[in-house]
Amino acid sequence: MGDTMVEPVPAKLSDPTLVLRGNGGSPLCVITEGVGEAQMVIDPDVAEKACQDVLDKVKLIRGSSAESLDKIDGSDTGDGGSLANGDAGPRHSESCGPPVSASRITEEEESLIDINSVKSARRRQKNNSAKQSWLLRLFECKLFDVSMAISYLYNSKEPGVQAYIGNRLFCFRYEDVDFYLPQLLNMYIHMDEDVGDAIKPYVVHRCRQSINFSLQCAWLLGAYSSDMHISTQRHSRGTKLRKLILSDELKPAHKKREIPPLSLAPDTGLSPSKRTHQRSKSDATVSISLSSNLKRTSSNPKVENDDEPVRLAPEREFIKSLMAIGKRLATLPTKEQKTQRLISELSLLNHKLPARVWLPTAGFDHHVVRVPHTQAVVLNSKDKAPYLIYVEVLECENFETSLVPVRIPENRIRSTRSVENLPECGITHEQRASSFTTVPNYDNDDEAWSVDDIGELQVELPELHTNSCDNISQFSVDSITSQESKDPVFIAAGDIRRRLSEQLAHTPTTFRRDPEDPSAVALKEPWQEKVRRIREGSPYGHFPNWRLLSVIVKCGDDLRQELLAYQVLKQLQSIWESERVPLWIRPYKILVISADSGMIEPVVNAVSIHQVKKQSQLSLLDYFLQEHGSCTTEAFLTAQRNFVQSCAGYCLVCYLLQVKDRHNGNILLDAEGHIIHIDFGFILSSSPRNLGFETSAFKLTSEFVDVMGGLNGDMFNYYKMLMLQGLIAARKHMDRVVQIVEIMQQGSQLPCFHGSSTIRNLKERFHMNMTEEQLQVLVEQMVDGSMRSITTKLYDGFQYLTNGIM
């Protein structure tokens, strides 16, 4: 308190008083001197200040701001509650009233507190109502998307807001919500009950509608609950919901399902015994019995299936079979033994197909009819045995209700062939289409061709499938056309030479078969050629709805980090597309089955840079020249641009997510020149053996720069420009990326979340406080540092010495 001065105040002569005033001129106290005694009287201004101090403390506790306090003080004088300033009422020293006692001041303080508390509560209620009104307008506007809904569901602490968001989920498209399914289920498992109660109705509703959604929920709930302690996990909400889903209680509202009549061709004359084929146990639960088929007549076109099938059992058994194969392969010592065992296991699996099973990674409804077992390959892995399979499916309208195709048995190939042994040569298109329900007689081994031995020949002799047969057939068509044409066609010699040279440049090279790396041959073969070849050898290939899918089965690996990386890549891809930045990345689908198993969507028409260098013994630039022609051709320039756009995109991904373990076995090169990074097992806070050896922002080798045209080339400058544009676009939408990672950190024990600074470091890598000029300098520094990084070279050398990765 500042200095004071004594100032006389008008009073009775017999009762002089002294008033102490502070620097502001306000009275501090009044001292009355009498005969033989000194009486202390509290001035109203002092009481006002004391009340104000109490109010400040109360409001501070209740979270009121100083601004609202000032507003209340200035507006409440008319109520007789408090005195805003010294001029609001007469001072006690100037009044004729008696002295104010201390007890009365205490009552006034309490009254002031009560009155102001009520007014403050009313004002807070008005403010909250205004905020809720604006929030409701936001929730109901067209710009409110799933990303914003997930953000408010995670950050809001108001049960009413959480419940509203839970209901709002029903308004979004299924595919938009499905993208955030890991976040929703992780919040359901690890956050409070209000969030779980808001999410559960939507999940239950979707599970009643879709078997595929039910299984994905069950798998994710099991995987994300595994981080909990066993005693807690057993009684957790996630475990209870998973049991509810797998108990098959969440069935559709209708109890019985009507089955459409089975159309029979009148001229087939097949007896019931001919039409009854061996089916799997899993399909037995969903297939239609022969007797029920015979009951469908013209007078009774529809017959209800009395026994409601077990909805989830067939698909679960199918997935378990694939996972069990991978576990058994891991016990074998050599790659050749693993490959032989894989082929025999898949051959046995084919005896249970077709069935009401499907690949969850596909984007359309279908039934699996066959697995060409000789085309399966074991992928490169030091300790485990991931394998790649191709799956023949028949597309259908609804895999839950559409009829399962009948089985067409495979038969052994003959060493000699004749016209008599080709029964399908005379089958018309209509007859082939009708064979969906009427199976031709394949009892005679001489009358059928098996894809098994054909596939073995193709694996042993891959050169036979990449010869010039297509060129010969095209040449024959061109010759016939030219012979039939009577008018001469003049073509410049230069155009002919250019077309021939570019055609040769587009002709893909082949890889030789390597017993230590059998996947190289399979992955190098063009996808369309593979589809054509497998379809020609398949007994189901003549169906118009035949499709070929592929999937990688992994056992012993936790794919939850892969799923997280996939979500971030998809979000970045969407951001760059919306901001019109021509960066290219290829996110591939991840299916988490459990905490140590899952499926991965393969990238077709792509091989690893390690396989390229090992098979061709060429530098990356020389391989580009071999595959796409000289550096002046249109094919090479297109491939070079694709390389630059994809390299810039993945460099930003590797920087933002801190992707490690970037050896050449984890970087693919596709037929169009793009690079694709795979294996995101080490991201954010984790690194191989937790050594943190790779210190560069991303991998940018001198070979990559050579493909771009060198340090002084236009394409290298284009690469740096794309890096800058991509980083600027990404930081504009930082929240959309960060929330994906932040929500998954809840309750997680994944290595990528070790340490308390994971999210903070991720946000810092977006450099929100930098100008665009500063970002440009940062990009230049990161590019220069990555090119000169000694740790990148040492890590590549370490991988070559330990694992033979070039």
UniProtKB/Swiss-Prot annotation:
Question: Locate the PI3K/PI4K catalytic domain: which residues?
Answer: 525-791
Function description: Phosphorylates phosphatidylinositol (PI) in the first committed step in the production of the second messenger inositol-1,4,5,-trisphosphate (PIP). May play an important role in the inner ear development.
Annotated stretches, region: Catalytic loop: 658-666
> What is the name listed in the Swiss-Prot or TrEMBL entry for this protein?
Phosphatidylinositol 4-kinase beta
Q: Where in the cell is it found?
A: Endomembrane system; Mitochondrion outer membrane; Rough endoplasmic reticulum membrane
Instruction: Name the family.
Output: Belongs to the PI3/PI4-kinase family. Type III PI4K subfamily.
Q: Which Gene3D superfamilies match?
A: Phosphatidylinositol 3-/4-kinase, catalytic domain (1.10.1070.11), Phosphatidylinositol 3-kinase Catalytic Subunit, Chain A, domain 4 (3.30.1010.10)
Q: What's an example GO BP annotation here?
A: inner ear development
EC class name: transferase
Q: Which residues form the PIK helical domain?
A: 55-247
Chain intervals for the UniProt region annotation (G-loop): 531-537
Q: Where is this region: Activation loop?
A: 677-701
What are its GO cellular component terms? mitochondrial outer membrane; rough endoplasmic reticulum membrane
| Lineage, uppermost ranks | Eukaryota, Metazoa, Chordata, Craniata, Vertebrata
State whether keyword Magnesium applies: no
Cofactor(s), names only, from the UniProt record: Mg(2+); Mn(2+)
Annotated Polar residues bias = 283-302
- Region feature (Disordered): 69-104, 253-310
Record's bilayer topology term:
Peripheral membrane protein
Which E.C. number(s) belong to this protein?
2.7.1.67
